[in-house]
Amino acid sequence: RVRPENLRGLFEIRPHASYRGFWKFDGFQESGYLHLDVHWEFNTSAEIHTGYNFTRAGVISPFEIVPGVEVPAGTYDHGELALNYVSNKSKPFSFELRTVVGGQFGGDRLSLTPTLKYRIGETFRSELSLNYNDYDLPYDGGQFTASLARLRLSYSFTPKIQLQALVQYNDTSDKMGTNIRFSWLGSANSGLYLVYNEVDERGVGGLPTGREFIVKYSYIFDVFS
């Protein structure tokens, strides 16, 4: 990392690189991801991330990326430009915008993910995000968009008692999922968990197609004491 002096409000420059890949036992590479990035942090605590990714996707058998659009088997090598803006996270309101432009599965993809966050101290946290993807693939029906909207809420009654909620909507499948979790923790994340899950088949206002209620309790003790 580099901390320049008197450079237009720039506080720190953090270049970095990483790689991850997965192979089957027969040597076939299922995925590869080489990430080259530079984080530019300003005196205001805002950040801009400028990166480039080299990707590899190994598709063993054809699959439907969305209903009616099939991606053939093969190995797809692409590059993508990644730009990310993050405002000051220490403020009650913060904003993040992630943009990715590049190739995927033999075609092109534009991905935009704006995220708005609001918090009240360490007690209440909320996060609203939208993941929008615009695809242009060289297959029948390969021009389409797909979006996933998420709302996260968290309230801490005490450091060990929390109520959390996640609501997300997928416009491709027109499904809405809801997850509500209450946790009363002891030591080492043991304790009581109450979880409610629901999936609505036809989006907002649709009838639920799946519901489940989960109760989990764990307790850690020392058998030698």
Task: Give, region by region, the residue ranges found by the protein language model.
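Exposed, low-structure sequence patches enriched in small/polar residues
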Residues: R1-S225
